[in-house]
Amino acid sequence: MKRKCIITGLVIGLQLVSGYNYVTDASWLSKTWDRLETNAAKQSNDWPKAEQYTHYVGGQIVGDTLPEEDMMILGVSLGNTFDSVKASLGQPTKETSRGITYGGVTFGNLKMDGVGPIVTYMMIENRDAVTHRGIAVGDSMRKVLNVYGRPDLVDSNNRWFYGKYRYRTDMMHGIQFEQKGDKVSKILIYR
């Protein structure tokens, strides 16, 4: 608490002496304060860390199925055909046998052997789309925590997963947030 008061006093003092535009400084102060709070949260035991998720037995089912609306991007659900995605969203910016891309949003298929061109995963790599709950690439992980709650899994690469999965397997059905620093860098929805 004492540290916050000292930092706040220094920032206000610098503003008074410098004569900068206060609107810009208020935005800077808000962002700086947010970073300080996020760093403090990361140091607490309440912040999700990978080592807090290692107590499960291999093969144990963990988490719950997310609501259908959480498993959609731009009105597209897992299981839609590529043709229905194109009918809904128009001509993609890129198309391969493994997926179709609209700007920073990819609808792909990782399954093989007899599975047609259906959407088995969706990936957001920029601010072209948001999740049903309003999270976008570039948002803070603290915002993800506030909106989605504690993740069902944090892996060794610090990716946060929400949904249902079988521990120590690749059987997962849900949404995953990858991060760089304290910001969302990629969002994946898959089964």
What annotation goes with each model-predicted range?
Residues 34-37, 43-72, 77-118, 123-127, ...:
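A cross-family detector of function-defining hotspots
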